[in-house]
Amino acid sequence: MCIRDRVYGSWSGGIFLIEIDEETGYPIYPEADEENHVDSYYGKKLLGGYHNSIEGPHIMYDETSGYYYLFLSYGNLQAKGGYQMRLFRCDTVDGIYTDAAGKDMYLFVEHKDHGLKMMGNYTFPSLTQTYMAPGGQTAFEDEDGKLYLVYHQRFAKTGELHEPRVHQLFRTKDGWLVAAPFATDGETLKEDGYSGDEIQGTFYLVNHGTDISDKVHKPQGIQLNADGTVTGEELEGTWEAEEGTPYIEVTLGENIYTGVVLAMTDEAGNDTMCFSAKSDNNETIWGVKYLLP
């Protein structure tokens, strides 16, 4: 018998995993095991329930990191419903899945504080529209070895019109995944990284936060200075690029964000230098520097 796992579920009961007989397509019902959150009909509970707005689960195994990544959509599926993408991980397919803060979601909790928020509502100076309600995601590794995130994107002032989008995913040094700020356009991560001189300059920073709301996360201007400091009107901190690698660490206040630096083209055709990084507080930040011709 060939067996596969299926992840499914939504708001009311939560997210479950059940084995599927690949030959018949029928579920293989397990024995109930209350201590390990196994229901004889629904299968193994991974997280959620209690009418928390969690749906659209997808699990991707990444052989490079050795983790199973659980992608989820939070919020209501409308442009102003706070729809967004979150991420958990585990080294086994059936859990326990934890977020970047090391927290799981078996019990009733305020779900906005759980799960690494990969992206929500945002805009950048070069974008002609404000991007709203990303979600309904799946992820995969392509034949070229790159990881991709596929999802649907809504916009401000266009009702419920939506479009499919594909962004490249990158592994952080500590084994999490972060998405490129812009739709993929053939960009490739430079494995030996960039020098400090190449990176430093004026960036537009978007912090996706952890809220579930119609708030649009707007860019703030910051400066990545040659002396390793970060300065801005409302933010200050430090930054450091790890020599010979694509990794970057940005500290803003008490929060440390780890991620990658890459060069890519935005949706308007501008060449940019970007960073995408996550923190143990479940926030993701994007920084974009527009490169002059």
Predicted regions and their residues:
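Carbohydrate-active catalytic/glycan-binding domains of CAZyme proteins
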Residues: 1-293
